[in-house]
């Protein structure tokens, strides 16, 4: 018995990798320091790391940072206690996005709706509810069926009352529902995908990380790759993401990297996940404004056959993005630098953080 009590915490620590214990904190006052950030978040548990990201040249706060707890339960407790206010300012905590995910369009968008793929014919709404309600309060569940045959099309949507359950579910990746492997990802509406595309196209350079010509491709020094934002220096509140220790940033934008796979100009569910073909030109055929992402054709592992016909929504062009997601450096930041016109959050340049 004594051995069991000793080994369980060790096993739990092994299971809970850093990516499950880290929070991105956006909207920080420029007066907030590591000390005040740490003091605030320690009320929910022990922090193993805490950092306020700063401009490498001026050392001025860039208005966001990261805190890492010792357990995922502490992260859950902190997120359950929102809103958070530090130094007189309401901040925006969000589960940090891991490096391998931060390059995907839409990875940093905050949504309450979850896409669930791999739904078998014997899976009913109550199976989804029983599984997902442990993550948060569910508003609606939809399992999409074929209008003519009435058969399940293999996917559905779960809408929560908050974005955090979606972030947590997507972060954990592997899910088994009613004995079947399921694929989960954020469900982006047509409008949200258009916003992602707009941010990825660079808007004249803003949000664009250049063309991967310099710094070994670390975000590139392309003209205008300055991520210059509004008064808070966040790129008008979109896409904070530095990538501390390889973690992408906060809400909005989805502006990292140039990986294809997200639906074309008409929206879609993107994701770069191969194997989901489409029926009628995409998931739902524009169902509820969630047009068909570019899931390819054929089978997705054991998620069932979705190869009726390939999507007619092509992959989104990567615009002026180099596609490199090399986030080198001790803070996973790659070459941040002050950027073209700098602002208070300029990417690009050659200075290492």
Curated annotation (Swiss-Prot):
Chief subcellular location: nucleus
Residue numbers bearing the N-acetylmethionine modification? 1
Q: Which InterPro entries match?
A: HnRNPA1/A2_C (IPR021662), hnRNPA2B1_RRM1 (IPR034486), Nucleotide-bd_a/b_plait_sf (IPR012677), RBD_domain_sf (IPR035979), RRM_dom (IPR000504)
Phosphothreonine: modified positions: 4, 140, 159, 176
Q: What residue ranges are annotated as transmembrane?
A: none
One GO biological process term is: mRNA splicing, via spliceosome
> Which SMART domains does this chain map to?
RRM (SM00360)
Residues bearing N6-acetyllysine? 168, 173
* Residue(s) carrying Dimethylated arginine: 203, 213
Q: One GO term of the cellular component aspect? A: nucleoplasm
Q: Which residues form the RRM domain?
A: 21-104, 112-191
User: Position of cross-link Glycyl lysine isopeptide (Lys-Gly) (interchain with G-Cter in SUMO2)?
Assistant: 22, 104, 112, 120, 137, 152, 168, 173, 186
Subcellular location(s) of the protein: Nucleus, Nucleoplasm; Cytoplasmic granule; Secreted, Extracellular exosome
- PTM description: Sumoylated in exosomes, promoting miRNAs-binding.
Q: Which GO molecular function terms does the record list? A: miRNA binding; mRNA 3'-UTR binding; N6-methyladenosine-containing RNA reader activity; single-stranded telomeric DNA binding
In this chain, composition skew of type Gly residues spans 202-223, 320-353
Any idea what job this protein has? Heterogeneous nuclear ribonucleoprotein (hnRNP) that associates with nascent pre-mRNAs, packaging them into hnRNP particles. The hnRNP particle arrangement on nascent hnRNA is non-random and sequence-dependent and serves to condense and stabilize the transcripts and minimize tangling and knotting. Packaging plays a role in various processes such as transcription, pre-mRNA processing, RNA nuclear export, subcellular location, mRNA translation and stability of mature mRNAs. Forms hnRNP particles with at least 20 other different hnRNP and heterogeneous nuclear RNA in the nucleus.
Alphabetized PANTHER family for the sequence: HETEROGENEOUS NUCLEAR RIBONUCLEOPROTEINS A2_B1, HOMOLOGOUS TO DROSOPHILA SQD (SQUID) PROTEIN
Q: Partners and quaternary state?
A: Identified in the spliceosome C complex. Identified in a IGF2BP1-dependent mRNP granule complex containing untranslated mRNAs. Interacts with IGF2BP1. Interacts with C9orf72. Interacts with DGCR8. Interacts with TARDBP. Interacts with CKAP5. Interacts with PPIA/CYPA. Interacts (via C-terminus) with FAM76B; the interaction results in retention of HNRNPA2B1 in the nucleus and inhibition of the NF-kappa-B-mediated inflammatory pathway.
Q: What is this protein called?
A: Heterogeneous nuclear ribonucleoproteins A2/B1
Q: Which organism is it from?
A: Pongo abelii
User: Its encoding gene is what?
Assistant: HNRNPA2B1
